[in-house]
């Protein structure tokens, strides 16, 4: 079954759900996908009274991203790979004129670039060149595996050993085949004008996680977030529809290069995963509450 805000209370037996349970959750800002699974799994085990209950997700989201994360319980975990293969839609905030090693706000700016020539029209005209199947170089700091080890773990290890980020990138570079089907500029902010940078819901789609909510995440205290909004750099909010495995951070990097500048992601929301939209997703609190109803 698919759990949504209007679903009837769950029974106490997981056997009543032979195909398992899928919960579309709006992942909070600064939570890892593992944080969400940990919270839901604890509630599900208590609710169904089954210690070996399987709980997983279909498609990870970066800590600084919000939006649809599909949580699978019981037999639904067998559907995770299929659910993950469906196309996705994102709403991304892209800041031009500067880059970061992680291509988002987890790392501080490492280089500045000219940006006076960038306009709303120029951004819109550049987007069609990204439509279609293409090879994409994954970010150095990513969840992609290299010989069975997460790339970000290897990147941090190599960096700690004294290698520069460029040297680490040469060892860990990975290219994937992706497909971008739609791109649209939703907003554009000229240099020096106020913007909604660091807003995990750049177009008002879904609530912004409060600091109190973010503090519940075990990872939030160790996830760095830089604030570059005071720099007054140009910024665009872009809607993207794409295939599994597309890194929106890498798209931001490539868009900046195409425009003769640099760029990084300042906000990201997965607004859709397959048929599941963020408007119909549950908060973590709603999911936990649904798993605590008395029967």
Question: For each of these PLM feature ranges, what is it?
Answer:
Residues 1-295:
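Catalytic/RNA-binding core of pseudouridine synthases
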């Amino acid at each position: 079954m698919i759990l949504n805000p209007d679903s009837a209370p769950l029974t106490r037996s997981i056997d009543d759900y032979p195909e398992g349970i899928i919960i579309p959750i709006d992942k909070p800002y600064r939570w890892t996908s593992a944080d969400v699974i940990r919270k839901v799994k604890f509630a599900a085990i208590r609710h169904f009274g089954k210690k070996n209950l399987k709980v997983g997700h279909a498609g990870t989201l970066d800590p600084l991203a919000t939006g649809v994360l599909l949580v699978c319980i019981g037999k639904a975990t067998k559907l995770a790979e299929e659910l993950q293969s469906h196309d996705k839609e994102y709403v991304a905030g892209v800041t031009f004129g500067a880059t970061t090693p992680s291509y988002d706000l987890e790392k501080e700016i490492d280089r500045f670039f000219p940006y006076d020539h960038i306009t709303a029209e120029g951004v819109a005209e550049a987007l069609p060149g990204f439509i279609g199947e293409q090879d994409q170089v994954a970010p150095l700091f990513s969840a992609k595996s290299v010989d069975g080890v997460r790339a970000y773990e290897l990147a941090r290890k190599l960096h700690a050993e004294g290698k520069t980020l460029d040297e680490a990138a040469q060892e860990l570079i990975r290219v994937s085949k992706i497909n971008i089907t739609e791109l649209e500029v939703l907003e554009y902010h000229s240099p020096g004008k106020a913007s909604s940078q660091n807003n995990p819901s750049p177009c008002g789609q879904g609530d912004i996680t409060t600091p109190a909510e973010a503090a519940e995440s075990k990872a939030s205290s160790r996830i760095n977030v830089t604030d570059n909004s005071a720099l007054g750099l140009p910024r665009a909010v872009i809607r993207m529809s794409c295939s599994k495995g597309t890194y929106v951070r890498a798209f931001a990097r490539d868009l900046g290069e195409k425009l003769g500048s640099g760029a990084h992601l300042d906000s990201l929301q997965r607004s859709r995963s397959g048929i599941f939209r963020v408007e119909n997703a549950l908060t973590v609190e709603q999911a936990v509450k649904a798993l605590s109803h008395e029967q």
